[in-house]
Structure formats: structure tokens, C-alpha cells
């Protein structure tokens, strides 16, 4: 007889039994005489530095870790030392998008687009009036593609600071606003609120990208950062028209729902405006394939590798609290210097994940 220890059930004030997922404990598939897995303590968070503000996003490029902390673009070395490069403005509480070309690092902050050039050590804003508001962006085939929620805009191939208004494109299969842009296998995914459209570079004198009609996904995303690349697909929180929010992975016109009924119930506890601020991140480490869903009072984590090994959806919860649930205080994961670098969403602290302690920033947390 096998003992189920990777999750449990409990009674609530509804007629249904609810699923109880591990809190700050990570399910690990491992067959034994009594169970098909075990729980190990969640990763600890160790601080090693501070920056000029709360971290808003990070990226590793050409051997250097870049972060936007407060309104400042900074670099972080292996010891946690922070060097300020320039100012990209606020709001300091909003996440940024970072992506790079061969020679420029792009930063979308507060509706603006900036470029850091490490060769000249200069930070400059794209001030072309035809660029418009930059809600999100990605780099693809030599272009920086941005969206203001309505149009798809590309910079000139020979000048990333120039925009030609006759080269605007749009995501028009459904009259829903564009929420985010992601690149997957050199195709651009325009994630709208009810649909996801895929574009490929076909060249031409006007907008150089063309919609791949057969690749459209009939579901959308709830917010700009509620999506990420995961397992060579796109993971997102959202749904189609007249659908409650859930968590999916999708690509090439197909989706797979990975959220369970319990996870869906937890999502329904948040308002639409709260869900619009959800952040998704992925992290592959030691035979685990994690998808983090950062919510206001904790983070839900899906493990695709464990789910495949156990034949059921494996979820667990992370929280930086001794009692109850509170915001999980590790965000914006960056693999660099042989460790996972993280930041604290509630302070200017930066650090890294460890497995020899379960403390978060020196404080004890619950199980």
C-alpha cells in the first residue's frame, strides 16, 4: 500500500473536498516501499548585496548580470556588488522587460524604450515619436518589436532608434488588446487578452512579419508579465472568451491546461486587476522543471518533470511567512556565476538560492 505524501485533501465551507499542496516543501519523485516520492525543504534565500531600489527585472548577457533596480539600470557581480549605469525612469514599482540584440541591451520601462551600449558605455532612450508607448517588446531577426496594446511596431534594421510608421503591423484576428510579446523558435507570439497570434518574418518593404493563421491559440493572457517561455512553449495565466482564468502551456495552435481545480479555485480568489500583475518565471534545475506563478500572497510552482514521472499534476506553494501566507520574497531569477540569483520584491536586497538552509533573507519560514 502506497502512502500519499505529495499532497493531501481537506474539507472546506463548500460541498467539495479541497486539495492541500505542500508549503515551502518541494515534491521529489522517488519510488520507495511506502510512497512514490518525498518532500524536501524548499530553497533558502541568502542576501549578498543591496541596490538603489526594488528590483524590477534581470537578465544575463555577455557574462554580465543586468538588473533594473528602482529607476536605475545596474550590473551585479558574483559577490553582489552593484554598479549603476544610468536611469530608465519609473514607475519604480512596475516590472520591466529586458532583451538584447548582438550589440544592444533593450529595456522597456514605464512605456519607454531604452538601449544600453556596452561598447560605448551609453544609455539612451528611443525618442522617435512614431514609436509610441512601449507596453512590451522583444528582439527578433535584427528588429526590436514593440507593442502599445494596439499596434505591432518594429524599429529600423539599420537604426534601432528610428521607426517608420508605414511599417506598423497589428494582431487583428480578434479585437482584443495586445498584452505581451514573446519570441519562441524565432517566431513572435503576440499574446492578446483572448487570443494568441504567431508571426513569422517574411520580409518586404512594409511590416516584415506575417501572421501564421494555423498557429493561432484561442486563449489569451491576463497581464503583460503573466507569461513566459517554458519547456519550448509559452506558459500563461488566462483563458478564452467567457472563460475563467487558468494556467496553460501552448504553442502551434494547441494548449495544455496544467492548473488543477484547486489551482483554479485559488486564482478565483483574486480580482482581475490583481491577476493582471501576476508574474510567471521558469527555472530548470536538477531534473526539475519549475514554473513559478507569483501571486500577491505567495507563489504557486508547477514541476513538469515531476508531473511526468508521477502521472499527476505536481504543484507546491512558496511563501515568506511564519504563519499563513504572504508574498514569496524571491523574484527575477537569473542563472549566473553557478547559482540562481534572486531579488527581494519588498526591499532593495539581492541574493541567491541555497539548499543548506530554508531561511528567507535570514528569517525562519513556515512549512
Each model region followed by its residue ranges:
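Surface-exposed extracellular loop regions of Gram-negative outer-membrane beta-barrel proteins
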Residues: 189-214
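Phosphate-interacting basic helix/loop segments used at nucleotide- and nucleic-acid interfaces
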Residues: 173-184, 275-278, 283-284
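Short, flexible helix-coil linker/hinge segments at the edges of structured domains or between repeats
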Residues: 152-175, 205-212
Amino acid at each position: 500500500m502506497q502512502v500519499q505524501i505529495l499532497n493531501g485533501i481537506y474539507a472546506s465551507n463548500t460541498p467539495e473536498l479541497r486539495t492541500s499542496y505542500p508549503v515551502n516543501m518541494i515534491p521529489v519523485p522517488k519510488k520507495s516501499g511506502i510512497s512514490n516520492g518525498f518532500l524536501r525543504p524548499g530553497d533558502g534565500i541568502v542576501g549578498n548585496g543591496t541596490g538603489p531600489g526594488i528590483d524590477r527585472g534581470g537578465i544575463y548577457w555577455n557574462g554580465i548580470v543586468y538588473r533594473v533596480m528602482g529607476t536605475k539600470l545596474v550590473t551585479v557581480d558574483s559577490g553582489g556588488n552593484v554598479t549603476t549605469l544610468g536611469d530608465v525612469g519609473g514607475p519604480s514599482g512596475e516590472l520591466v522587460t529586458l532583451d538584447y540584440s548582438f550589440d544592444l541591451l533593450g529595456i522597456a520601462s514605464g512605456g519607454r524604450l531604452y538601449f544600453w551600449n556596452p561598447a560605448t558605455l551609453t544609455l539612451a532612450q528611443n525618442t522617435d515619436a512614431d514609436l509610441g508607448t512601449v507596453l512590451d517588446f522583444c528582439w527578433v531577426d535584427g528588429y526590436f518589436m514593440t507593442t502599445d496594446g494596439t499596434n505591432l511596431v518594429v524599429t529600423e534594421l539599420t537604426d534601432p532608434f528610428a521607426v517608420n510608421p508605414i511599417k506598423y503591423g497589428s494582431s487583428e484576428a480578434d479585437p482584443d488588446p495586445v498584452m505581451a510579446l514573446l519570441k519562441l523558435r524565432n517566431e513572435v507570439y503576440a499574446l492578446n487578452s483572448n487570443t494568441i497570434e504567431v508571426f513569422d518574418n517574411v520580409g518586404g518593404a512594409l511590416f516584415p512579419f506575417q501572421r501564421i493563421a494555423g498557429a493561432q491559440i484561442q486563449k489569451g493572457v491576463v497581464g503583460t508579465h503573466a507569461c513566459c517561455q517554458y519547456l519550448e512553449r509559452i506558459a500563461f495565466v488566462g483563458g478564452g472568451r467567457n472563460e475563467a482564468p487558468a494556467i496553460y502551456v501552448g504553442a502551434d495552435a494547441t494548449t495544455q491546461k496544467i492548473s488543477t481545480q484547486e489551482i483554479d479555485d485559488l486564482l478565483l480568489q483574486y480580482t482581475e486587476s490583481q491577476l493582471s500583475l501576476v508574474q510567471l518565471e521558469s527555472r530548470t534545475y536538477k531534473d526539475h522543471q519549475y514554473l513559478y506563478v507569483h501571486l500577491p500572497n505567495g507563489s504557486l510552482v508547477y514541476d513538469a518533470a515531476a508531473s511526468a514521472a508521477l502521472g499527476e499534476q505536481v504543484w507546491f506553494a512558496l511563501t515568506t511567512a511564519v504563519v499563513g501566507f504572504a508574498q514569496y520574497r524571491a523574484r527575477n531569477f537569473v542563472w549566473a556565476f553557478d547559482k540562481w540569483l534572486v531579488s527581494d520584491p519588498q526591499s532593495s536586497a539581492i541574493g541567491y538560492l541555497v539548499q543548506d538552509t530554508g531561511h528567507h533573507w535570514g528569517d525562519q519560514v513556515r512549512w
